[in-house]
Design a protein with these regions (language model features):
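Conserved acidic carboxylate
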Residues: 8
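Charged docking surfaces used in two-component/phosphorelay signaling
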Residues: 15-23
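Short hydrophobic/Thr-rich beta-strand motif most characteristic of the beta2 strand and flanking loop
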Residues: 25-32, 40
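Acidic catalytic/metal-coordinating carboxylates
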Residues: 33-36, 59-63
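Hydrophobic alpha-helical motif in two-component signaling modules
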Residues: 38-41, 50, 64
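Active-site residues of response regulator receiver
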Residues: 52, 80
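Receiver (REC) domain active-site loop signature in two-component systems and cognate sites
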Residues: 55
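Alpha4 helix (beta4-alpha4-beta5 surface) of REC/receiver domains from two-component response regulators
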Residues: 62, 82-101, 107-114
Length: 119
């Protein structure tokens, strides 16, 4: 089973994303900030890191950088309203990540996750 770790500080958004991905057959573990997600990544492997960029305690770009140091094969997708931040980022993991700009429909999220994991 494909394992997704989700980091999103908005409780409602995190719940919507988690339910949509679980309904699509994915195992999802979610956290409200990058720091907690990073601690979990250190404990067990995941197939995909799905993360917001702007979060408390550790932003999504830093989370992606640290997570890719632990697992260079980890696929990364940013969900954000701040796509320009990614375009100007000098972190290699962020440059190779897929970006899904908010707002988006949940079916678009599932389709993009499927496409990324199939690559």
């Amino acid at each position: 089973m494909r394992r997704i770790i989700l980091a999103e500080d908005d409780d409602s958004m995190r719940g919507f994303l988690e339910r949509a991905l679980e309904r699509a057959g994915y195992y999802v573990v979610s956290f409200a900030n990058g720091e907690e997600a990073y601690e979990r990544i250190k404990q067990e492997p995941f197939t995909l890191l799905l993360t917001d960029i702007v979060m408390p305690r550790m932003d999504g770009i830093e989370l992606a950088r640290k997570a890719s140091e632990i697992d260079p094969e980890l696929k990364i997708m940013f969900i954000t309203g701040f796509a320009a931040v990614i375009l100007n980022c000098d972190v290699a993991a962020a440059k190779e990540a897929h970006v899904l700009s908010k707002p988006f429909h949940l079916k678009d999220l599932v389709r993009e996750v499927e496409r990324l994991l199939a690559a």
